[in-house]
A protein has these predicted regions:
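C-terminal interaction segment
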Residues: 3-65, 73-136
C-alpha cells in the first residue's frame, strides 16, 4: 500500500495521477518505489476542489486500467464512503456506506473495514437524518 506521493500511471508514460491511497498486489509493481502501473484498489478522499474530477474524468480514466477492481471515494464532510466494484469487464457496482457498522470487504486483500474504523480519529461526524451535502 502506498499513500499520496506515488504516481499512478493511468496511461503509460502519458498521464499520471497521485491517488490518496493505492494498493497493488501485482509482482510487476513490487520493485517500484515511486510509480505504480497495476492498482487493485484506489482510494480518493474527496475535497471541494477535486470532487468533480475524482467522480468524473479521473474515475473514467481509472476504469480503463485492467487491474483495478475497487475504487473508494471517502467524504470529509460526514461518514460516507462510496464503493465502486468491478463486477465484470465494463460493469461497476456502486454501494454507498453511511452507517457505523457498514463495511468495505475486499476479499483479494483479506480486508474488512467498517466506517467506524475508517473515520476513527478523523474528526468527521456521522451522517444524521437531516444531512444534506453542501453545494460546491
Amino acid at each position: 500500500m502506498l499513500i499520496e506521493t506515488v504516481q499512478l500511471a493511468v496511461e503509460e508514460n502519458r498521464h499520471y495521477t497521485y491517488p490518496d491511497i493505492v494498493v497493488s498486489c501485482d509482482p510487476r509493481d513490487q520493485h517500484e518505489s515511486r510509480r505504480l502501473y497495476h492498482p487493485l484498489l484506489i482510494v480518493e478522499v474527496l475535497s471541494p476542489s477535486t470532487e468533480a474530477y475524482d467522480r468524473g474524468l479521473k474515475f473514467n480514466q481509472y476504469k480503463k486500467m485492467p487491474s483495478l477492481r475497487h475504487y473508494l471515494l471517502v467524504s470529509q464532510k460526514t461518514w460516507l464512503v462510496e464503493w465502486y466494484q468491478l463486477i465484470e469487464p465494463g460493469v461497476w457496482s456502486h454501494t454507498a456506506l453511511a452507517e457505523a457498522a457498514d463495511a468495505v470487504v475486499i476479499a483479494e486483500l483479506n480486508l474488512t473495514l467498517t466506517l467506524t474504523q475508517i473515520y476513527e480519529d478523523a474528526g468527521v461526524a456521522p451522517m444524521t437524518a437531516g444531512f444534506e451535502a453542501e453545494e460546491e
